[in-house]
């Protein structure tokens, strides 16, 4: 049996998480870095998936297409973008095992550093597009329902940077297909801040049914920055945002079932934060210093270590040869 550490580095695009995560993996002989499947996203269809989403938003804003047509494009793109993550998650799930007993500080034999978790394409970015009026809440609920169960030892690193610095970084990187959209950036920062609040709320024993279920829906307050130590109430979470949006569309039962599923998926995640306003090497150091606090798992079978490593390497290989 071996020890496996899984680290999911996630957050709004343009923060510098990819630079830090890949640098952390490259300095360790026991780590595999799994990048965003950009080659898959650019080869799965007639055009780049990222460009497809931004173009749909831009054309809808200009009145060239209506909201229904834009939603169809965005829903299809988000679903396709989630496929590599969800498929890999299902492949390695039988080999993850359980967390060791408390106090056992044996270091991991293998570290997987993922550039994003499935919730990015099935929860966070769809909700941001809902806020920019490019995706109806019914479509968001459909995607949330596809979020896979959270295995033991799921470590999620979120992070933030000042809004003005974030926008300038996004403009400077000039990723193909990506448009510098300040409104979308505000929306995705808002969603990830609410995500951090949601995990804290659930892990403190919060129940959306008790705190939100009997009250009129309302939009969450402006959330604090990710990493705020205060414990948020239920009204300042993704659960409140989705609860309010679903209730206004007359789909209360479906919304409730989906919120139960989402709470189950998020409650057991081990969440950490990085301050990306620091220089790149300092961001790497922050991630490095977080590793000893993370939860690993003990693989259930002798062959599990090799199966997980082979799957990770195949992910990297296939994602770069899918056009």
From Swiss-Prot:
Coiled-coil segments on the chain, per record: none
Keyword match Flavoprotein: no
Stored Gene3D superfamilies: P-loop containing nucleotide triphosphate hydrolases
Nucleotide-binding found in the keyword field: yes
Catalyzed reactions per annotation: thymidine + ATP = dTMP + ADP + H(+)
GO BP: DNA biosynthetic process; TMP biosynthetic process
EC number: 2.7.1.21
Binding positions (substrate): 54, 78, 175
Record keywords, A-Z: ATP-binding, DNA synthesis, Early protein, Kinase, Nucleotide-binding, Transferase
Annotated catalytic residues: 36 (proton acceptor)
Positions of ATP binding: 11-18, 169
SUPFAM superfamilies reported for this sequence: P-loop containing nucleoside triphosphate hydrolases (SSF52540)
Top-rank taxon: Viruses
Quaternary structure and interacting proteins, as annotated: Homodimer.
Function: Catalyzes the transfer of the gamma-phospho group of ATP to thymidine to generate dTMP in the salvage pathway of pyrimidine synthesis. The dTMP serves as a substrate for DNA polymerase during viral DNA replication. Allows the virus to be reactivated and to grow in non-proliferative cells lacking a high concentration of phosphorylated nucleic acid precursors.
Official protein name in the record: Thymidine kinase
Organism: Bovine herpesvirus 2 (strain BHM-1)
């Amino acid at each position: 049996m071996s020890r496996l550490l899984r680290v999911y580095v996630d957050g709004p695009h343009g923060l510098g998480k990819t630079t830090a995560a890949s640098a952390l993996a490259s300095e360790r002989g026991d780590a595999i870095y799994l990048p965003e499947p950009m080659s898959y996203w650019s080869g799965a269809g007639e055009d780049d998936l990222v460009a497809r989403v931004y173009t749909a938003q831009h054309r809808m804003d200009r009145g060239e297409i209506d909201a229904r047509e834009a939603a169809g494009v965005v829903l299809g793109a988000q679903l396709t973008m989630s496929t590599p993550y969800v498929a890999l998650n299902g492949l390695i799930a039988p080999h993850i095992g359980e967390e060791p007993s408390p106090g056992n500080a044996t270091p991991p034999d293998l570290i997987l550093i993922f550039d994003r978790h499935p919730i990015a394409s099935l929860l966070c970015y769809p909700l941001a597009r809902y806020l920019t009026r490019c995706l109806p809440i019914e479509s968001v609920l459909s995607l949330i329902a596809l979020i896979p169960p959270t295995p033991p030892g799921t470590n999620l690193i979120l992070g933030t940077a000042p809004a003005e610095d974030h926008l300038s970084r996004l403009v400077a990187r000039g990723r193909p297909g990506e448009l510098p959209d300040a409104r979308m950036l505000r929306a995705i920062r808002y969603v990830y801040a609410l995500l951090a609040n949601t995990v804290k709320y659930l892990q403190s024993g919060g129940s959306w049914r008790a705190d939100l279920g009997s009250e009129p829906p309302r939009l969450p307050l402006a959330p604090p920055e990710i990493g705020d130590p205060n414990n948020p109430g239920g009204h300042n979470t993704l659960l409140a945002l989705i609860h309010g949006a679903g209730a206004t569309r007359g789909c209360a039962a479906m919304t409730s079932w989906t919120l139960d599923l989402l709470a189950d998926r998020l409650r057991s995640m081990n969440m950490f934060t990085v301050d990306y306003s620091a220089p790149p090497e300092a961001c790497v150091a922050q991630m490095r210093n977080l590793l000893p606090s993370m939860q690993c798992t003990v693989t259930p079978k002798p062959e599990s270590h090799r199966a997980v490593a082979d799957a990770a390497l195949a992910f990297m290989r296939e994602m770069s040869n899918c056009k």
